[in-house]
Amino acid sequence: KTYEGSADNMADALEVMRGLIPTHVVFNGKKGSMTGDNALKAKVGEKVLFIHAQANRDSRPHLIGGHGDLVWEAGSFNDKPDTNLETWFIRGGSAGAMAYEFRQPGIYAYVNHNLIEAVLLGATAHVVVEGEWNDDLMMQVAKPAPISG
């Protein structure tokens, strides 16, 4: 459906909003804005601070491949941070922060842990981390191969 003017869709938009069922849940304004060529970049050993703000709905951020070394769920750096969280909680209408030191190279996925929103609606960001693999942290015991059976 198309509209001639920017306000012409108001009745249809309000009808969708009344259902409280989002059609998009995105990071940085649009689906895919922080994946592929637009992925965030980091290097092994770098500490990265993630700020997560949520307007209307609660969110459960999670870094697949890592975790929150330091997490300020309510966003106040004056408060003592929680440590080593897999997933944390950001209340609707608030913001929080998480710091993580990348220890291995690879592609990490920062998601809303409601994975339906992450995968189908766009709440995913990627961090491409460059550097040398550290076998002291994790060793590959068998090379990747096709699954048989």
Segments predicted by a language model, with ranges:
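Copper-binding active sites and cupredoxin-like electron-transfer domains
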Residues: 1-149
